[in-house]
Design a protein with these regions (language model features):
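N-terminal targeting leaders of membrane proteins
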Residues: 2-85, 175-238
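Surface-exposed interaction patches
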Residues: 109-112, 125, 130-220
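Mid-length scaffold segments of soluble, non-membrane domains
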Residues: 65, 69-147
Length: 238
């Protein structure tokens, strides 16, 4: 378990967002990949996500809950790596309750009982460990982010907390992947629709992601989920 040796961020540090503009030395290459990603999004992902948002609320809720629950074991791993013991206990409790009583996570029983979910990933963990952001990397299909987060994504793909593969696990994993892509894209539609109105969509999206990830790392360092809009008087929240 990693024990943090850095002080918690002050309120001023928390609300000021990233300390510097994202470092994007390969911007021209990144913009080329971004153009490919945008075409894929414009003609496939975004239309599917918009259609998904017209499904009944209970269907969308079930998909969202299933995807969130399937990811809880990786959240637990990162809670431990970040030294967030209380959060790890909460994650285990949520996963056990929702997987059983909540029918493999389709119903967020824990949330109804006041046991709120939080997110954690390897990119956040690296940030909690004070590993630097690194340059911006636009990845095909995966989008924009810094090198630290890109490495975290690669590690997440490689880690399988469910152990040996089986037909059941493979099926659930496939459903989780497809559901996660569609549900996640639908969740981001309001943000991306707003950013598309900016003169430079690439830069606007890159900077918005950088700010949100900086706040996400702060959550990991503090060991709690933050309402940044309320805490900072209008700043973006994750």
């Amino acid at each position: 378990m990693c024990i943090r040796d850095s002080p918690a961020p002050s309120s001023t540090q928390l609300c000021q967002g990233p300390l510097a503009a994202p470092h994007d030395p390969a911007e021209q290459v990144n913009r080329g990949i971004f153009a490919f990603n945008r075409s894929l999004d414009d003609y496939l992902l975004a239309p599917v996500a918009r259609g998904y948002r017209h499904l009944p609320g209970f269907v969308q809720g079930g998909v969202h809950n299933f995807v969130a629950n399937f990811g809880e074991p990786k959240v637990f791993i990162n809670d431990l790596l970040q030294g967030n013991g209380q959060r790890s206990v909460t994650t285990v409790g949520r996963f056990a309750l929702n997987t059983t009583v909540g029918i493999v996570g389709l119903i967020d029983v824990s949330g109804r009982l006041g046991i709120e979910r939080h997110e954690a990933d390897f990119g956040q963990t690296f940030g909690v460990w004070n590993i630097t952001n690194g340059p911006i990397v636009e990845l095909p299909l995966l989008g924009t982010g810094n090198l630290r987060d890109a490495t975290g994504k690669a590690l997440s793909f490689a880690v399988s907390p469910f152990g040996s593969s089986s037909d059941t696990v493979d099926t659930l994993s496939t459903l989780n992947t497809v559901g996660g892509i569609v549900d996640g894209r639908a969740e981001l539609l309001p943000l991306t629709d707003q950013l598309r109105t900016e003169p430079d969509y690439y830069a606007a999206l890159r900077d918005a992601v950088a700010e949100r990830r900086a706040h996400f790392v702060t959550e990991g360092k503090l060991g709690e989920q933050l309402d940044l809009a309320r805490h900072c008087g209008g700043n973006d929240e994750r």
